[in-house]
Amino acid sequence: ACKDNFAAATCKHVKENKNCGSQKYATNCAKTCGKC
């Protein structure tokens, strides 16, 4: 299940700020963060 549960803009922002390490974002922005 490789998808972003949060809005695309939110996940883009998360990745730019290197917040993909956060469990919340790693799970909800899996596609953008490449966690799958």
Swiss-Prot record:
UniProt keyword Ribosomal protein present: no
Annotated stretches, region: Crucial for binding to potassium channels: 24-25
Disulfide bridge map: C2-C36, C11-C29, C20-C33
InterPro entries assigned to the protein according to its UniProt record, in alphabetical order: ShKT_dom
Main location class: secreted
Pfam families: ShK (PF01549)
Record's function text: Blocks voltage-gated potassium channels Kv1.2/KCNA2 (IC(50)=140 nM).
Family per record: Belongs to the sea anemone type 1 potassium channel toxin family. Type 1b subfamily.
Protein name: Kappa-actitoxin-Avd6a
